[in-house]
């Protein structure tokens, strides 16, 4: 009997597209990821980032970590912008792989993502997913706004129900190791 706006994501006639990665939100591999000081429940979202040139053509892909502020988003879907667009909240890298004869969008379509979070006191959370399970093909989505530099495709969205994965009282994630493979 409980309804959530997320129950219908990916099945309606309209693609759920929102902007991400304002100029100050993207950071490279190895840099600190930013968290909003008012958030106490946030988690990583490993994603595939599509790189698009100025003509709107997808030219490559990279790994991405789209940090999500669960407590903000959970209060209201209207806070999605605040939950997503924060300084340094979108880590990209460690490299961009350009498409060529051996690596194409078809490879991206079948990419499997796995993630493991190793935290204090032996806490471990693991998850995996395949982009082959995503509800929409990425290429038609790229025509929505060809001026965009990078798009992220999310399927793996790890979180523990009603329990913050990471406490950021010190503005640092409370885990020892994050692996995306």
Regions found by a protein language model. Name each.
Residues 107-149:
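Active-site neighborhoods and metal-handling regions in enzymes and metal-associated proteins
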Residues 1-119, 127:
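Active-site microenvironments in enzyme catalytic cores
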Residues 138-181:
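A conserved acidic, glycine/proline-rich C-terminal tail/linker
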